[in-house]
Amino acid sequence: MYLYGASGHCKVVIDSIESSTSKKIEGIFDDNINLKKILNIPIFKYQTFDKQRIKELFICVGNNSVRKLISENIKANYGTVIHANACISKYASINEGTAVLANAVVNASAKIGKHCIINTGAIVEHDCELEDFVHISPNASLAGNVKIGEGSHIGIGAQIIQGISIGKWVTIGAGTVVIRDVPDNSLFVGNPAREIKK
């Protein structure tokens, strides 16, 4: 397996892979020519990327829009990364390119899209539906039947009550408590959540 993006998030992905699988990480591609290694994994210039020899790839980029752009520009066999200490229901579905990190919970009948991040200690309860490129930050909690639109970012420790719909490319600030639906392309913060004009 190869990784793309030599960031702090990459370190967490490496740790998750090593915790839960015998897959060997062959290297990391990045456009920062000054980086040589991360956690003893060699870093290669993006210009040397050859998709013909890459059997499996994973994008280690926290920024949702950048992750989407990379996935659209690089057609590859994308794997999933699931930490050994994540708790995932056998009735949940998780699509390619998604990471579920340490102590995260994905419960029964939850559906997780492509290239999502379910970060450390995050909770995705029963029947939630996450579209592609969503990031659920550490210790954020989604109650049952929550829907999250493409590219949305749910901040650290945010809480979303049951049955709420969050639009596409929304930002929910850290610690925010969401008790009503949120429209596309908006920024909400506070308890209860209120909209901030971008």
Question: What are these regions, as identified by a protein language model?
Answer:
Residues 1-2, 25-26, 53-58, 168:
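Short active-site oxyanion
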Residues 9, 34, 194:
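Conserved Rossmann-like nucleotide-cofactor binding loop
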Residues 14-16, 69-73, 112, 183-184:
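Short amphipathic alpha-helical segments
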Residues 34-89:
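Phosphate-bearing ligand-interacting subdomains
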Residues 1-17:
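Glycine-rich adenosine-cofactor-binding loop
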